[in-house]
Regions:
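C-terminal output helix
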Residues: 102-113
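Active-site T/S-Asp motif of two-component receiver
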Residues: 50-51
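Acidic, metal-coordinating helix/loop segments flanking the phosphotransfer/catalytic sites
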Residues: 29-47
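Acidic catalytic/metal-coordinating carboxylates
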Residues: 32-35, 57-62
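Receiver (REC) domain active-site loop signature in two-component systems and cognate sites
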Residues: 54
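Alpha4 helix (beta4-alpha4-beta5 surface) of REC/receiver domains from two-component response regulators
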Residues: 61, 82-99, 109
Length: 122
Protein backbone atom coordinates (compact mmCIF):
# COMPACT_ATOMS: atom_id res chain seq x y z
CA UNK A 1 0.00 0.00 0.00
CA UNK A 2 1.19 3.53 -0.73
CA UNK A 3 0.36 6.31 1.72
CA UNK A 4 0.54 10.08 1.41
CA UNK A 5 1.71 11.62 4.68
CA UNK A 6 1.13 15.37 5.15
CA UNK A 7 2.66 17.12 8.16
CA UNK A 8 4.55 20.38 8.61
CA UNK A 9 6.76 19.05 11.45
CA UNK A 10 9.84 17.21 10.11
CA UNK A 11 10.20 15.06 13.25
CA UNK A 12 6.54 13.97 13.10
CA UNK A 13 6.91 13.18 9.38
CA UNK A 14 9.95 11.04 10.18
CA UNK A 15 8.18 9.19 13.02
CA UNK A 16 5.05 8.40 11.01
CA UNK A 17 7.11 7.51 7.94
CA UNK A 18 8.95 4.96 10.09
CA UNK A 19 5.63 3.67 11.50
CA UNK A 20 4.26 3.20 7.98
CA UNK A 21 7.43 1.57 6.68
CA UNK A 22 7.47 -0.83 9.66
CA UNK A 23 3.97 -1.83 8.60
CA UNK A 24 5.27 -2.52 5.08
CA UNK A 25 3.86 0.55 3.34
CA UNK A 26 5.48 2.91 0.86
CA UNK A 27 5.26 6.58 1.81
CA UNK A 28 5.14 9.86 -0.10
CA UNK A 29 5.53 12.92 2.12
CA UNK A 30 4.37 16.52 1.89
CA UNK A 31 5.35 19.36 4.20
CA UNK A 32 2.01 21.20 4.16
CA UNK A 33 -1.56 20.99 2.94
CA UNK A 34 -0.99 22.70 -0.40
CA UNK A 35 1.90 20.39 -1.24
CA UNK A 36 -0.17 17.43 -0.10
CA UNK A 37 -3.03 18.32 -2.43
CA UNK A 38 -0.59 18.81 -5.29
CA UNK A 39 1.02 15.40 -4.65
CA UNK A 40 -2.22 13.49 -4.00
CA UNK A 41 -3.07 10.96 -6.69
CA UNK A 42 -6.08 8.71 -6.01
CA UNK A 43 -4.67 6.14 -8.42
CA UNK A 44 -1.41 5.94 -6.45
CA UNK A 45 -2.28 6.64 -2.81
CA UNK A 46 -4.44 4.11 -0.99
CA UNK A 47 -4.59 6.26 2.16
CA UNK A 48 -3.88 9.86 3.17
CA UNK A 49 -2.59 10.70 6.64
CA UNK A 50 -2.60 14.36 7.55
CA UNK A 51 -1.87 16.56 10.51
CA UNK A 52 -4.70 18.87 11.51
CA UNK A 53 -2.97 22.16 12.25
CA UNK A 54 -0.60 23.28 9.50
CA UNK A 55 0.23 26.64 7.92
CA UNK A 56 -1.83 27.47 4.86
CA UNK A 57 -4.34 24.63 4.63
CA UNK A 58 -5.36 22.62 7.66
CA UNK A 59 -5.68 18.86 7.44
CA UNK A 60 -9.43 19.31 7.58
CA UNK A 61 -9.32 21.64 4.55
CA UNK A 62 -7.19 19.06 2.73
CA UNK A 63 -9.70 16.31 3.53
CA UNK A 64 -12.69 18.43 2.53
CA UNK A 65 -10.98 19.36 -0.77
CA UNK A 66 -10.23 15.71 -1.56
CA UNK A 67 -13.87 14.80 -0.84
CA UNK A 68 -15.18 17.78 -2.86
CA UNK A 69 -13.21 16.43 -5.83
CA UNK A 70 -15.16 13.18 -5.51
CA UNK A 71 -12.38 10.98 -4.15
CA UNK A 72 -13.14 8.29 -1.57
CA UNK A 73 -9.54 7.52 -0.60
CA UNK A 74 -9.38 6.79 3.15
CA UNK A 75 -8.13 9.78 5.14
CA UNK A 76 -6.74 9.73 8.67
CA UNK A 77 -6.30 13.05 10.47
CA UNK A 78 -3.74 12.93 13.26
CA UNK A 79 -4.18 15.77 15.71
CA UNK A 80 -3.09 17.10 19.03
CA UNK A 81 -5.05 20.32 18.66
CA UNK A 82 -8.38 19.74 16.89
CA UNK A 83 -11.49 20.77 18.79
CA UNK A 84 -14.52 18.51 19.11
CA UNK A 85 -16.22 20.65 16.46
CA UNK A 86 -13.26 20.10 14.11
CA UNK A 87 -13.39 16.37 14.80
CA UNK A 88 -17.12 16.26 14.02
CA UNK A 89 -16.52 18.07 10.70
CA UNK A 90 -13.76 15.62 9.90
CA UNK A 91 -15.99 12.64 10.66
CA UNK A 92 -18.74 14.14 8.47
CA UNK A 93 -16.19 14.13 5.63
CA UNK A 94 -15.51 10.45 6.31
CA UNK A 95 -12.18 11.13 8.02
CA UNK A 96 -10.85 9.00 10.87
CA UNK A 97 -9.42 11.19 13.65
CA UNK A 98 -6.55 10.00 15.83
CA UNK A 99 -5.27 12.06 18.75
CA UNK A 100 -1.57 12.61 19.41
CA UNK A 101 0.30 11.10 21.06
CA UNK A 102 -0.70 7.75 19.60
CA UNK A 103 0.99 4.46 20.45
CA UNK A 104 2.29 2.47 17.48
CA UNK A 105 -0.10 -0.47 18.08
CA UNK A 106 -3.13 1.84 18.17
CA UNK A 107 -1.95 3.62 15.01
CA UNK A 108 -1.44 0.30 13.21
CA UNK A 109 -4.88 -0.99 14.22
CA UNK A 110 -6.65 2.22 13.20
CA UNK A 111 -4.86 2.32 9.84
CA UNK A 112 -5.75 -1.31 9.11
CA UNK A 113 -9.39 -0.65 10.05
CA UNK A 114 -9.67 2.43 7.82
CA UNK A 115 -8.16 0.66 4.83
CA UNK A 116 -10.27 -2.46 5.39
CA UNK A 117 -13.49 -0.43 5.60
CA UNK A 118 -12.57 1.41 2.41
CA UNK A 119 -12.04 -1.92 0.67
CA UNK A 120 -15.44 -3.22 1.74
CA UNK A 121 -17.29 0.03 1.07
CA UNK A 122 -18.37 0.40 4.69
Amino acid sequence: MKALLIDDEPLIRDIFTQFLELLGHEVDVAADGREGLARFDPLVHQVVLTDFLMPGLTGLAVAETIRARGHTTPIVMISGSATLRDERRAMQAGVRVLRKPIPFAQFAAALAEVVEHAGTGQ
